[in-house]
Amino acid sequence: AKGVSLFTYPTAGYFDTFFFALLSSIGGDDYFKKVMSYEKNIWTGSEATQALNLVGKLLTQYTLPQTVGYANNQDYTKNQAALMADKALFCPDGSWVAGEMKDAPRSAGFAWGLTTVPAMKKEDRHLTSFIESVWIPSGAKNKASAKTFIAWLYSDKATGLFAKAGAAMPTKTGTKGLPAEVAPFYTVYDEPGLKSTIGGFKSAKAVPGIDMKTALLDSVDSVASGKLSVKDWQAKVNEASNKLGGH
């Protein structure tokens, strides 16, 4: 539609989960693990090339013009507000966005929703998921009580309390009772063919001046503004990955 862009993003850092799901969608779970483990020249292969070209096209041809100017820690909510004002259709974000933007103006009929990254194969749709962890220290004095508490976290009562607060436990009833505004962020997992991508880059020995976030994510704004070509972006990411992998 006239005046409506396909895409925007809060800040470049939000592309982490976008890339993780996209790489899984293109190359599969085993390929994703290879990328996260810094396999030699993994970013020069056809899968990574396809992913970077797709994102490059999205950034240079279909992104809301205001995005780069507001893609910083002070103004990023203006890009999220653009989504709510029907100036853009899609935006990578987290389930917290509904609460973060609860007081922002919105167009008539606006409602939050969640979908997967583009599917490369039929019935093979990917989302990146963050899962909070709970564990018992080996030196804990009350391990039995701790185990009882952890078990209780998965009870109907506990999942109901989580749902009331807008969060979901990974149980069969975990999405019941969620506020209507945030429910789509979790009920999407009930859809057939949806796969959850979990994980991130493997911890690696520090290399001075090298960081995957800088190479892969912080370059997004430069690609969007035309200051960095996809080819140079790919070379930059591959170099960082190889150095962190010890190649």
For every predicted segment, state its role.
Residues T8, L89-G94, G113:
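Paired acidic/hydrophobic, glycine-rich loop segments that form the ligand-binding mouth/hinge
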Residues D103-A168, D218:
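Extracytoplasmic/periplasmic substrate-recognition and gating elements
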Residues A1-T44, N79, A88:
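Extracytoplasmic/periplasmic solute-binding protein
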Residues S25-D30, Q61, G139-A146:
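Short helix-loop capping/hinge motifs at secondary-structure junctions, enriched
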Residues A168-T175, Y186-G245:
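C-terminal capping/gating helix-and-loop segments adjacent to ligand/active sites or protein-protein/ligand interfaces
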Residues V68-M84:
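Short helix-initiation/N-cap motifs at beta->coil->alpha
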Residues P10, D93-M101, E132:
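Beta->alpha turn/N-cap motifs
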Residues Y38-G69:
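Glycine-centered hinge/linker elements that transmit conformational signals in sensory
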